[in-house]
Amino acid sequence: AEYGQALSSVLLLSTIDEPMQEATNINIMSAGGGIGHTEKWDTTSLSVNASYITLAPYLAIFNDRNDWEKPFEAVSGEAVFRKKFKNGLFKFYTAFDRTNFELTQEDINVPTGVTFGLKNRNVYTNMRYSGVIGDGLTLDTGASYTVAKTDVLVQENAIQDTENSAHLKVKVKKRFSSRFKLSIGAEQFLTTFEEDFSNPFFADSYGFNNHITGFFVESDIVFSRKFALKAGIRSEY
């Protein structure tokens, strides 16, 4: 009942509470590398990492049948911040990635070859707070935001996609006993999508907005060590 939309946009309210220890990681590969570091303080911690991959050195040594205008290149990074409070925990996560390449492939029907290019730029951010607000009562709140941009080039046909998505969620859970707990929550999905198509002879733009509000109630009932029941109901509009 808690997760709707066929789990296509799940905002998980359960993640790692705290890193185990401070650490620095360095990865070296033939086509790139990465670095990451985790720092801990009394009530806070911060983890960051980044990676970079490029096929340019590989293609300079090993030629293939494609004419690379821009060899495959990808860069990504993420950061996680955690803050402990007296009765709760706040987490903030953000990540980005960028992919870019362009090539001309051989084609028996096109003497000059078929040009294909792709650029992806994505940014994702979420935050979550979980804490105790009463006797056996806990509060979970979360929000996420995504920006995804894609540029595709096939010969003289150019397609540009832009998607902005937001997800807001709040859940209250009450533990009545070791055998019964009840969760009540609500969430909001907001999505905007735009696509532009163009070539020397034609151009068009289209898109959509999708807003969904959901409510759910879910219970966990333990009858014995071997038998338990999870039941719930969900409504969306």
What are these regions (language model features)?
Residues 24-28, 48-50, 92-94, 141-143, ...:
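Membrane-embedded beta-strand positions of outer-membrane beta-barrel proteins
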Residues 43-46, 56, 87-90, 135-139, ...:
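Repeated loop/turn-to-beta-strand initiation elements of outer-membrane beta-barrel proteins
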Residues 1-24:
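N-terminal periplasmic accessory domains that precede
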Residues 15, 39, 82-85, 131, ...:
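Residue-level signature of outer-membrane beta-barrel architecture
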Residues 183-237:
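Signature of Gram-negative outer-membrane beta-barrel scaffolds
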Residues 55-61, 66-76, 88-165, 200-207:
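Flexible loop and strand-edge segments within Gram-negative outer membrane beta-barrel domains
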